[in-house]
Amino acid sequence: MTTLEIWLLAISLAMDCFTVSITSGIIMRRICWRTFFIMAFFFGLFQAVMPLIGWFAASRFSHLIEDYDHWIAFGLLAFWGGRMIKESFSNEDKRCFDPTKLKVVVTLAIATSIDALAIGISFAFVGINSFTSILSPIVIIGFTSFVISTLGSLIGVFCGKRFNLRMELWGGLVLIIIGVKILIEHLFLS
């Protein structure tokens, strides 16, 4: 793979992180750099580590992973999306979806990085055959996801302040749509 192809791949993998970060920023409605960097760190970390795991396990476990990875991603995103929709109709004191909580961030990071696991498996079949040859792609993927997630959070805060239209409802729908997209891609388009 060329460097340009790796950057384009990194940008495309970061789009789910970007969307989830926008959703989180919308819910927060204020700039909280610490939270944004923690979220971006975990998104970048999981986007970088998953291809490494996929690449490493490609020859041994690919048949086990590919049968249900999309269901895991869908389930996690649908769960958090459903909670957000439910919470959009409840009192603010009773809301559980909190993008500042580590459990929420890690769950979303795992869900949005399942595709990166599949990319790692494909790396094993396109001539990336040593740790030194996969190091550059995973660093680029992780860095890109970090930067794009941070930008998404900022965009979300801006949108959340300008539009006060049950943003948790819309954010929950976005998470469910991402989950459905992943499911459709794996069930019908692969």
From Swiss-Prot:
The chain crosses the membrane at residues 6-26, 36-56, 61-81, 108-128, 138-158, 169-189. Probably functions as a manganese efflux pump. The keyword Transmembrane applies. It holds the Pfam family Mntp. Belongs to the MntP (TC 9.B.29) family. It is a multi-pass membrane protein. It comes from Phocaeicola vulgatus (strain ATCC 8482 / DSM 1447 / JCM 5826 / CCUG 4940 / NBRC 14291 / NCTC 11154) (Bacteroides vulgatus). GO terms for cellular component: plasma membrane. GO terms for molecular function: manganese ion transmembrane transporter activity. Keywords: Cell inner membrane, Cell membrane, Ion transport, Manganese, Membrane, Transmembrane, Transmembrane helix, Transport. It is found in: Cell inner membrane. InterPro entries: Mntp/YtaF, Put_MntP. This is Putative manganese efflux pump MntP. The keyword Chloroplast does not apply. HAMAP family: MntP_pump.
